[in-house]
């Protein structure tokens, strides 16, 4: 597996610092549930950046990484839905909880194709929510235009997740080396878009 370069380490360090910054400053005016959800999402991004920085890309081989990384899109999407779609709060929170539970169960059971389908479904719905909701709200004028950057960040993290998923399935879209080369920059760009939005 590709070793971390100095540039990779610098990008991951800035990613971790940016995630820590967002956790420390919080989200202005957010209620308790969205604040908890965003803090969880950024906390897992902080942890991911630090683990990659310390252990290198080898830590991506751990099955636990798949389970823990599921918290990122689920937490961020729960925060967005709770904050901007009040009628969907409970149904979406139930989906997120059940989806996370299914990802854990299918990974523990080693369910092969079932685990992959479950992961793709849960990540897909959460990822589309993070990507689409901020863009829609910005286009409708419900929020400041800059909030669209959150959607762009959602698209970037979704792209990174898909690249890693296909790599893990043994069917990478790009060469494994190329995926690992772009991953640190993709994480930093994602977090930059989230924080700026």
Show the residue positions of the predicted features.
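N-terminal topogenic module of multi-pass integral membrane proteins
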Residues: 1-60, 181-182, 191-196
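Structural signature of hydrophobic alpha-helical transmembrane segments
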Residues: 32-44, 66, 86-98, 144-157
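Membrane-proximal helix-loop-helix units in multi-pass membrane proteins
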Residues: 80-142
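C-terminal ends of transmembrane helices
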Residues: 26, 48-61, 103-116, 162-173
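Cytoplasmic-side transmembrane-helix entry/capping segments in multi-pass membrane proteins
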Residues: 60-72, 91-96, 116-125, 175-183
């Amino acid at each position: 597996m590709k070793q971390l370069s100095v540039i990779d380490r610098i990008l991951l360090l800035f990613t971790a610092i940016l995630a820590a910054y967002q956790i420390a400053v919080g989200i202005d005016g957010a209620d308790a549930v969205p604040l908890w959800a965003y803090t969880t999402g950024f906390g897992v991004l902080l942890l991911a950046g630090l683990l990659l920085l310390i252990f290198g890309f080898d830590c991506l081989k751990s099955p636990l990484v798949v389970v823990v990384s599921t918290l990122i899109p689920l937490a961020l999407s729960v925060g967005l839905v709770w904050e901007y779609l009040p009628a969907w709060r409970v149904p979406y929170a139930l989906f997120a909880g059940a989806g996370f539970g299914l990802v854990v169960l299918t990974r523990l059971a080693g369910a092969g194709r079932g685990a992959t389908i479950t992961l793709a479904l849960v990540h897909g719905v959460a990822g589309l929510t993070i990507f689409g909701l901020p863009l829609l709200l910005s286009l409708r004028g419900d929020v400041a235009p800059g909030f669209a950057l959150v959607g762009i960040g959602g698209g970037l993290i979704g792209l990174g997740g898909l690249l890693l998923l296909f790599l893990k399935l043994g069917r990478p879209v790009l060469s494994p080396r190329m995926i690992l080369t772009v991953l640190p920059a993709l994480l930093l760009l994602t977090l930059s878009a989230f924080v700026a939005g």
